[in-house]
């Protein structure tokens, strides 16, 4: 229950009414109710007109006077600045009420005409005002979101710039290492070519020595035949001659043996140097493989960076489309500042999208260059591996030939018949040191099967589609 105080005041019209102007204060009955405020409510004025045949009864129990019949009462509810609700009851006669109603109708008709001329339909204006208020609230919220997002994007772009600088320095270091590797590979190629030439020269020398050995064996056989034929005629002369010939032959054999031992040592040194060069080439190939793996990892990092940049670019494009759609809508004169802010934000977004496109294009160029360098290095490494395998095959072939010559010499010395003349046959061999079998099997082909050209094609196709 609300506690209220009420007062009733009755007025009677005393003045004469002029024609054409209704009297507003005749037979007025005021009822004032003061109600304590429940909640702060905006000031509103509502007018209720009720037609009553009987006098009203107050709810607070006070005695009221009998009001005259045929009077229309109006109740007005208002609130004063002191946050108190008041109710005032006014009373009019029927003629006054009709005049008031006609006057109100005329005023409403004129106001409706003026409103239609100025603003058009009132309902449409209310809807437009509501829509504009909603758009303003949404635009303020979007502006706050865009400001925060733009700050985050600015920090992200700064981090991207720092990463781009680090990647540029890394690419410069990689280019330097690539130049060093290419120089080392060319030096190794020259060394292998020189080794191949020395191998060919040593093979020629070995063939010449083999021919000399065959000629010496033929001379030895001729001498034996002569000795056998001349033993019966003159044994002593033949012995002297055979001694002289044997001494000469022995000197020649010793000299040939010394030369052969020297050449054998030279060949052993050359083979050792070949093996060392092959080991160094294997080590360099392993280092090149490690550098290729590092480059693959860096290419993967660049790919991930490019994907993040493309996602960022897509988000910025979506924001730009939202700004453009918002700018393309109808805006009132009060939204010019908002329109200018949207234009500035869209221009900054376009600039950032252009900057991201340039960065993505630059990173794609770097990835393509690194991929081409990796492919060229792979081809060079494969060529070096083929050369090393060919050299190892030649070494094994030389070892087989040497073993075959040694076995032939052993066979000839064993099957040669002994004569009465005491002679010594010295077998001259040119055996090379057997190379360890593990060295020839240590060379393995590179296990990399990653070809980043497919990734470059995917990136280029994505860029053309966007």
From Swiss-Prot:
Residues 1-10 have a biased composition (Polar residues). Residues 45-55 have a biased composition (Basic and acidic residues). Its main location: cytoplasm. One of its GO terms (cellular component) is anchoring junction. It is a peripheral membrane protein. One of its GO terms (biological process) is intracellular signal transduction. Residues 1-68 are annotated as: Disordered. It is found in: Cytoplasm, Cytoskeleton; Cell membrane; Cytoplasm, Myofibril, Sarcomere, I band; Cytoplasm, Myofibril, Sarcomere, Z line. InterPro entries: Tuftelin_GRINL1A/MYZAP/CCD68. The keyword Membrane applies. Residues 1-16 form the signal peptide. Keywords: Cell junction, Cell membrane, Coiled coil, Cytoplasm, Cytoskeleton, Membrane, Signal. Detected in heart myocardium and lung. Residues 95-137, 187-415 form a coiled coil. Plays a role in cellular signaling via Rho-related GTP-binding proteins and activation of transcription factor SRF. Targets TJP1 to cell junctions. In cortical neurons, may play a role in glutaminergic signal transduction through interaction with the NMDA receptor subunit GRIN1. Belongs to the MYZAP family. Interacts with DSP, MPRIP and TJP1/ZO1. Interaction with MPRIP inhibits the activation of transcription factor SRF. Interacts with GRIN1. Interacts with DYNLL1. This is Myocardial zonula adherens protein. It comes from Mus musculus (Mouse).
């Amino acid at each position: 229950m609300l506690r209220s105080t009420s007062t009733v005041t009755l007025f009677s019209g005393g003045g004469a009414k002029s024609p054409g102007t209704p009297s507003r204060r005749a037979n007025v009955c005021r009822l004032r109710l003061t109600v304590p405020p429940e909640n702060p409510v905006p000031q509103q004025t509502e007018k209720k007109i009720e037609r009553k045949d009987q006098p009203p009864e107050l709810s607070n129990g006070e005695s009221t006077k009998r009001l005259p019949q045929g009077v229309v009462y109006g109740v007005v509810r208002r609130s004063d600045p002191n946050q108190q609700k008041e109710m005032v009851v006014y009373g009019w006669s029927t003629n006054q009420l009709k005049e008031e109603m006609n006057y109100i109708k005329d005023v409403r008709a004129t106001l409706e005409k003026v409103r239609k001329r100025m603003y058009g339909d009132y309902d449409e204006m209310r809807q437009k005002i509501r829509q504009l208020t909603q758009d303003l609230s949404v635009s303020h919220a979007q502006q706050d979101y865009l400001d925060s997002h733009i700050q985050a994007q600015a920090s992200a772009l700064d981090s991207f710039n720092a990463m781009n600088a680090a990647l540029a320095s890394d690419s410069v270091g990689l280019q330097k290492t690539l130049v060093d590797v290419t120089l080392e590979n060319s030096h190794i190629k020259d060394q292998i070519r020189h080794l191949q030439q020395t191998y060919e020269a040593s093979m020629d020398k070995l063939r010449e020595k083999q021919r000399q050995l065959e000629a010496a064996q033929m001379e030895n056989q001729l001498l034996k035949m002569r000795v056998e034929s001349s033993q019966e005629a003159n044994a002593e002369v033949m012995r002297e001659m055979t001694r002289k010939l044997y001494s000469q032959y022995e000197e020649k054999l010793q000299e040939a043996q010394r030369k052969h031992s020297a050449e054998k040592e030279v060949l052993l040194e050359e083979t050792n140097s070949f093996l060392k060069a092959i080991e160094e080439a294997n080590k360099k190939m392993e280092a090149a493989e490690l550098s290729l793996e590092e480059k693959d990892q860096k290419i993967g990092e660049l790919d991930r960076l490019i994907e993040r940049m493309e996602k960022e670019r897509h988000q910025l494009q979506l924001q730009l489309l939202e700004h453009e759609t918002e700018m393309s809508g109808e805006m009132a004169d009060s939204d010019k500042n908002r329109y200018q802010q949207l234009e500035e934000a869209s221009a900054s977004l376009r600039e950032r999208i252009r900057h991201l496109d340039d960065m993505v294009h630059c990173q794609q160029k770097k990835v393509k260059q690194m991929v081409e360098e990796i492919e060229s290095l792979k081809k060079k490494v494969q060529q070096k591996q083929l050369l090393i395998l060919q050299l190892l095959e030649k070494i094994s072939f030389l070892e087989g030939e040497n073993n075959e010559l040694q076995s032939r010499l052993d066979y000839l010395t064993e099957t040669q018949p002994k004569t009465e003349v005491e002679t010594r046959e010295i077998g001259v061999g040119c055996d090379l040191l057997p190379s360890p079998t593990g060295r020839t099997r240590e060379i393995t082909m590179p296990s990399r099967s990653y070809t980043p050209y497919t990734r470059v094609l995917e990136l280029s196709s994505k860029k053309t589609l966007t």
